[in-house]
Regions:
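Membrane-water interface at transmembrane helix exits
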Residues: 9, 46, 50, 87, ...
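Short runs within selected transmembrane alpha-helices of multi-pass transporters and secretion channels
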Residues: 1, 63-90, 94-114, 119-143, ...
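Transmembrane alpha-helical segments of multi-pass transport proteins
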Residues: 102, 153-194
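Juxtamembrane/interfacial segments around transmembrane helices
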Residues: 4, 38-44, 81, 114-121, ...
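Hydrophobic alpha-helix feature that most strongly marks membrane-spanning transmembrane helices
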Residues: 1, 13, 32, 54, ...
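Specific pore-lining/lateral-gate transmembrane helices of multi-pass inner-membrane transport
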Residues: 1-100
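Membrane-helix boundary/juxtamembrane motif in polytopic membrane proteins
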Residues: 23-26, 94, 147-157
Length: 194
């Protein structure tokens, strides 16, 4: 974001729309390359990571961590769409509306889900709220033909396949490995290699 915002603002000012779109596409590509493995990796190693990092008595986090990891992609997509594109192109009102909508959804869902599901409800509400904000921004840039969102998602397909393969391999190894720093290190290395 820090690198892209001034560059996109300059290209927008100079009316270099095509070059601006290319940079944004590269940012989306980066989101997929980094975000999918992080999300899938956290989901896959949670059962080993929690006891090693937190110790015993924190089993609830084994469920919360994978739930929260689902927000990695919407947060990253919102960053590219909102911070790196909408704000530098003087569409702050759309960005603000998406953030406000996300906040309203989060508060509303929290009021229903926390009393019933406690921390699981809070985690789920946060993920849903992030998705709502992301969807609002993405729909806006697609409807206004500012970014080719179909292309954004089509470039992600191979990364999703690789991420799912990595998840499955690490999850199977997670069942075999012992819960130790060495076991966790092995799982992380395995995921990195895949």
């Amino acid at each position: 974001g820090t690198v892209m915002i001034p560059r996109i603002a300059k290209l927008f000012h100079d009316k270099k729309t095509e070059q601006m779109r290319q940079y944004i596409q590269q940012s989306y590509q980066f989101v997929w390359i980094i975000g999918i493995p992080i999300m899938m990796g956290v989901m896959a190693i949670a059962d080993t990571f929690v006891p090693v990092f937190y110790g015993s008595g924190y089993d609830k986090i084994k469920i919360l961590l994978p739930i929260y990891s689902l927000s990695v992609i919407p947060v990253a997509l919102s960053n590219v769409t909102g911070c790196q594109f909408l704000i530098p192109t003087k569409k702050q009102n759309v960005y603000s509306a998406a953030v406000l909508s996300s906040t309203v959804v989060n508060v509303t869902l929290n009021s229903f889900l926390i009393p019933r599901f406690l921390s699981y409800g809070a985690a789920s509400a946060s993920v849903i709220a992030e998705c709502v904000g992301c969807i609002i921004m993405i729909v806006y840039v697609e409807v206004k033909h500012l970014v080719d969102i179909k292309r954004v998602f089509s470039i992600s397909l191979k990364k999703w396949v690789a991420g799912i393969v990595m998840f499955l391999c690490v999850k199977v190894s997670n069942e075999i490995c012992n819960t130790s720093v060495l076991g966790l290190t092995f799982l992380i290395l395995e995921g990195t290699i895949i």
